[in-house]
């Protein structure tokens, strides 16, 4: 049950701050931005990502290693339901749809994540997952961050990528999984930290 205080101006600002954390997570993981990943968690946070359970530094090491063979990653979030337990703690349930393209060389990471299933041999595979982030948020020092995350997996599927799949024109702005992505160039161009 919600109270009228759940929608006060202060609470609306809290909801917006928590939602921004979710969006920053998506950008950081999709661009493999280690500082961005670290920035959404409290230093003592615990993440339960299924095959990985541990602290923030170990999560970053696990993601960096696992994503080495993933040239494309896109996390889309929706249905962000935020419930406040206290003035400085909240529970957020966020629906997620993630598409990750595993290169033929990166399939060992896919097999480790899917119990041995990794798509057809010799071809890239797109993994599509539907899940929910169940995040315990805490405001410390005036900043909302994740204190504990559990990823609840709901469904998934895989599709092999055809060898003749369309390629983008190299002159276009094309997404990258590093600080050379167009978003970081635009951030720097207007004076935001890259």
How should these model regions be labeled?
Residues 89-93, 123-125, 130-163, 169:
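Short beta-strand edge/turn micro-motifs at domain boundaries
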Residues 160-194:
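Acidic/histidine-enriched, glycine/proline-rich intrinsically disordered or flexible terminal extensions
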Residues 29, 41, 96-98, 150-153:
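Short beta-strand segments enriched in hydrophobic/aromatic residues
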Residues 1-27, 31, 39:
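Short, low-complexity N-terminal intrinsically disordered segments enriched in polar/charged residues
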Residues 102-126, 175, 182:
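Mixed-charge, low-complexity intrinsically disordered segments
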Residues 34-115:
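A solvent-exposed, acidic/Ser-Thr-rich amphipathic alpha-helical stretch
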Residues 16, 71-73, 126-128:
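Transmembrane beta-barrel outer-membrane domains
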Residues 21-24, 36, 40, 78, ...:
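Short, hydrophobic/aromatic alpha-helical segments in well-folded domains
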